């Protein structure tokens, strides 16, 4: 229906599966395209995580994990990874990937044209290190424990009150832990009242 939240829609789920798991060719079939912009969820981990600072059996939290690619990538380096997203649809598909390892889907190419694809977690990643939970980043459950790493990718500009969310992290992030925030900072009143924007005013 038209009242369905975007992040629960089939369109969003398809787009995010492509964004997280699509091949370079599927994401950008044009050779002149910006190839260095592809595979963003992987790059959030490979380029931002300071692996040398991790201790034994590190734990990671992926807040706003969507369909889970960064969560799985964190499992390359962390013993336990928790992915949380507000979207029930995103978490449902992330859990299917955790259990099955792959998931067929269809994405829009142009107009009414679509293409079949398969989202696949890389074989070398231990999916048993990962669990996904539906939850609200603004009101996190109290039994999560503490983490060595907290990743917030493409989340902070979609929160009602970013500062309030960040203030929760003092109880979730170990002393000396890593907080990784990546964002285009596309502030929109539909998600964040302008009085709560962290910039752009």
Describe each model-derived feature in a short phrase:
Residues 34-57:
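Conserved alpha-helix/loop element of class I SAM-dependent methyltransferases that forms part
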Residues 57-66, 82, 180-201:
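Conserved class I S-adenosyl-L-methionine
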Residues 87:
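Conserved SAM/SAH-binding beta-strand->alpha-helix loop
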Residues 96-138:
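S-adenosyl-L-methionine
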Residues 135-150:
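A short acidic, Gly/Pro-enriched loop at the edge of an enzyme's catalytic core
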Residues 149-161:
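A short SAM/SAH-binding and catalytic strip from SAM-dependent methyltransferases
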Residues 163-175:
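A short glycine-rich, Lys/Arg-flanked "PGG" loop and its adjoining helix->strand segment in the class I
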